[in-house]
Amino acid sequence: MKTTCLLISLILIQGVKTLPILEIASNIQPQNVDSVCSGTLQKTEDVHLMGFTLSGQKVADSPLEASKRWAFRAGVPPKNVEYTEGEEAKTCYNISVTDPSGKSLLLDPPTNIRDYPKCKTIHHIQGQNPHAQGIALHLWGAFFLYDRIASTTMYRGKVFTEGNIAAMIVNKTVHKMIFSRQGQGYRHMNLTSTNKYWTSSNGTQTNDTGCFGTLQEYNSTKNQTCAPSKKPLPLPTAHPEVKLTSTSTDATKLNTTDPNSDDEDLTTSGSGSGEQEPYTTSDAATKQGLSSTMPPTPSPQPSTPQQGGNNTNHSQGVVTEPGKTNTTAQPSMPPHNTTTISTNNTSKHNLSTPSVPIQNATNYNTQSTAPENEQTSAPSKTTLLPTENPTTAKSTNSTKSPTTTVPNTTNKYSTSPSPTPNSTAQHLVYFRRKRNILWREGDMFPFLDGLINAPIDFDPVPNTKTIFDESSSSGASAEEDQHASPNISLTLSYFPKVNENTAHSGENENDCDAELRIWSVQEDDLAAGLSWIPFFGPGIEGLYTAGLIKNQNNLVCRLRRLANQTAKSLELLLRVTTEERTFSLINRHAIDFLLARWGGTCKVLGPDCCIGIEDLSRNISEQIDQIKKDEQKEGTGWGLGGKWWTSDWGVLTNLGILLLLSIAVLIALSCICRIFTKYIG
């Protein structure tokens, strides 16, 4: 009887501690699974901001039921790229992240911002984008969007150009899972409501039967079990409690989480849904019509765990992949005698892997060498190099195999970073200017730490010119630059190409004649007088006419040059003001976050906070386009077009006809007078 009561009590306590989120089907024995499904958030450092930039063009075919999802807003200079937006979540969940005392760690959305999203959603970016090639943001998290007008509404038939500067708040453990290839297998989710997920179609990867890639419909009636991973990896246990409440009419609550299930690389009570995948290129390879929409800036991407002779050797890290862009606030980890991976790559950015200490990991001295050809290697045995973009795969093949030394770690993992006197270890801190802010009563939420500290890097894409270039400090070493904070890239398309073969186009200074002849009054009178001299006058008049034509062409050329320079100046000014407007909105959001517990910005400032930043970029763009159209219109020839009686020659012909008629009338009158004189006389 006592044993039964004890078991019932333990079951009740376990039911209180674990949070029902989802059900995971696994073939792995319970003793091989590290129980990471429970836990509470101890400090806000465990919640990190992951920012990224979306760009491109999309046409909204139908209005969305909810406006809390990604959108693209017109009115700013569009990028000249093709873009395909991925999954648009049909069900939106409210989310709450609380500390152990039950206090919410997510601030309420500002009241003066329309359609401010705070929901669980599913998004995927196809093509050559930061999260391209099958990596889906399918984790439970709070999504906070900052676009150019603080609005995420999409309207019917509207072409949305330009992207959003987005931020997603996730748990640190989940954040680490997104950019680390920890498990080769995947888990099966049983959701009570109809959902969409991504399945990979790449057959070259082993154990690649999983749940990302091509968009497919999924509901609880389907019974697809993904291949589990061979060995779970131990993870930190500091995770936020997540409570999901569906706001959609067809959404219901989620099933109970089994703490003994296969969840080695997921913190379901944190903010993740659990799916992880190896880096594949199947989705991007099948999208032939897509082109790159992002500048080539370093981006954390998944990496493969080392699996040597025994299953206890694991390394966990973040690989910065060239050709990808992702503004991510990476957690600061205390490195211990770690080394980095350095490869000779033809891409702009070298691959680097800051190693992260792992819980319950001891005596890691195994070295793993990545093969030169990723497709012919076994991913479960070696550390794979990230696959490049399909458009740059030929020029970015690795020429040297990197060697990774797995660090020695202790059997415990601390969630708070500790300063290390070792200079090499300091280089492995992902954010050099990462503020070490722990949760204390009365402290502000450092959610915007990564976005505020991230440098702005305008890295141009093809057919693009930039006017700003704020790179990292000159004193930073090359190794430190590899681990620099990710950049927020804001690159706008610049002045379009104009036909340079057009005569007197005014595109550059050499098109127009340097000498502009101004004829004086005396010269005009002299030319007019000399033109009446027989034989000599027509020659003088011809030279005079040739000079006038040359001057006219030169004036037209200079006017075109002035129009081109004016249009370029207006575009540069529009670009600067657009970026300033964007950064002003971001700063306003940050101020709203900081002043939220005192009632918001408007409560502190009063009526002075109601300042609207009007977006007149579309009007300016239309004026620039009109200037370009006007200056590109050419009127060549002698005006022979149109109706003959309204052209220049038509007027002369009419005058000639009138003159001939007058002469004929005079001759006729003269003849009539002679006839009358003859008969009368």
Swiss-Prot record:
Residue ranges of coiled coil: none
GO biological process: fusion of virus membrane with host endosome membrane; symbiont entry into host cell; virion attachment to host cell
S-palmitoyl cysteine-type lipidated residues: C671, C673
Stretches for region Receptor-binding: 38-188
InterPro entries in the record: Ebola-like_HR1-HR2, GPC_FiloV, GPC_filovir-type_extra_dom, TLV/ENV_coat_polyprotein
Cellular-component GO terms for this entry: host cell plasma membrane; membrane; viral envelope; virion membrane
The keyword Transmembrane helix appears for this protein: yes
Disordered, as annotated region: 222-424
Residues in the signal sequence: 1-18
Chain positions carrying an annotated carbohydrate: 94, 171, 190, 202, 207, 219, 223, 255, 310, 313, 326, 337, 344-345, 350, 360, 397, 408, 422, 487, 564, 619
Domain notes per entry: The coiled coil regions play a role in oligomerization and fusion activity. The transmembrane domain is essential and sufficient for recruitment envelope glycoproteins into VP40-enriched multivesicular bodies.
Family of this protein: Belongs to the filoviruses glycoprotein family.
The protein's name in its UniProt record: Envelope glycoprotein
Species of provenance: Lake Victoria marburgvirus (strain Angola/2005)
Gene: GP
